[in-house]
C-alpha cells in the first residue's frame, strides 16, 4: 500500500466531509467550504470521523493516485480549519508593497507600479512595506498566487534583489573581478 494513502484522514470537530457517488469531495469548516472532484477509480469513504481512501488495484498509476487523493483531502481539511499562508519578502532599494482596497500594489523598480487584483479565496496582508502575506483556505490557489507575484521580479544571484519566499535561500554568485 501507499504509505501516505493507507493512513486515514482525521476529521476534527466542526468539520463535515461529504462524498458524492461521482467522487466529488466537499469539506465544510469554520473558515469556509472546499469542493474537489477526485479520480473516479479511488474509493473514498467516511467512517467514524475518518476519511478512508482505497484503491482498486496495485498498479503503479493507482498507487500514485492513492497517495495523491489522500493528500488532497488532508489539505482540504487543514485548509477549512487552519488555512494556509505564504510569506513573500521584497528585497531591493525602493521595493515596497501596499494595499489599495483589496488589490495589491507593488513598486519593484519598474517605471510603473504593478497591480495584483484580488482573487476570490485569497487575501493579502502587509505587515511591513517589504513583506506580503498571501492567505487562503485552498493550498493550491495560495501557492499559485504567491508564485505569480514572485514572477514579477525573481531574485537575482548577484545582489539578491527581487521577490523571494521568506524561507527561500538565494544562491549567490560572485561578480566579475577586475584586472
UniProtKB/Swiss-Prot annotation:
A Pfam match: Ribosomal_L6
GO MF annotation list: rRNA binding; structural constituent of ribosome
GO CC list: cytosolic large ribosomal subunit
InterPro entries with a match to the protein in the record: Ribosomal_uL6-like, Ribosomal_uL6-like_a/b-dom_sf, Ribosomal_uL6_a/b-dom, Ribosomal_uL6_bac-type, Ribosomal_uL6_CS
Gene3D superfamilies: Ribosomal protein L6, alpha-beta domain
Keywords, sorted A to Z: Ribonucleoprotein, Ribosomal protein, RNA-binding, rRNA-binding
GO BP, one annotated term: cytoplasmic translation
Function: This protein binds to the 23S rRNA, and is important in its secondary structure. It is located near the subunit interface in the base of the L7/L12 stalk, and near the tRNA binding site of the peptidyltransferase center.
Assembly and binders: Part of the 50S ribosomal subunit.
HAMAP family: Ribosomal_uL6_B
Family: Belongs to the universal ribosomal protein uL6 family.
UniProt name for this protein: Large ribosomal subunit protein uL6
Species: Clostridium acetobutylicum (strain ATCC 824 / DSM 792 / JCM 1419 / IAM 19013 / LMG 5710 / NBRC 13948 / NRRL B-527 / VKM B-1787 / 2291 / W)
Taxonomic path: Bacteria, Bacillati, Bacillota, Clostridia, Eubacteriales
Amino acid at each position: 500500500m501507499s504509505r501516505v494513502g493507507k493512513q486515514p484522514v482525521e476529521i476534527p470537530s466542526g468539520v463535515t466531509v461529504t462524498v458524492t457517488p461521482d467522487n466529488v469531495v466537499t469539506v465544510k469548516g469554520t473558515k469556509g467550504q472546499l469542493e474537489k472532484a477526485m479520480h473516479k477509480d479511488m474509493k473514498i469513504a467516511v467512517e467514524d470521523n475518518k476519511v478512508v481512501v482505497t484503491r482498486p488495484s496495485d498498479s503503479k498509476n493507482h498507487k500514485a493516485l492513492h497517495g495523491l487523493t489522500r493528500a488532497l483531502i488532508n489539505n482540504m481539511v487543514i485548509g477549512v480549519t487552519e488555512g494556509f499562508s505564504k510569506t513573500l519578502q521584497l528585497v531591493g532599494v525602493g521595493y515596497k508593497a501596499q494595499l489599495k482596497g483589496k488589490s495589491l500594489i507593488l513598486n519593484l523598480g519598474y517605471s510603473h507600479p504593478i497591480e495584483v487584483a484580488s482573487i476570490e479565496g485569497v487575501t493579502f496582508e502587509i505587515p511591513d512595506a517589504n513583506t506580503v502575506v498571501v492567505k487562503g483556505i485552498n493550498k493550491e490557489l495560495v501557492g499559485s498566487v504567491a508564485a505569480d507575484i514572485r514572477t514579477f521580479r525573481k531574485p537575482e544571484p548577484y545582489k539578491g534583489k527581487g521577490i523571494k519566499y521568506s524561507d527561500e535561500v538565494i544562491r549567490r554568485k560572485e561578480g566579475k573581478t577586475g584586472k
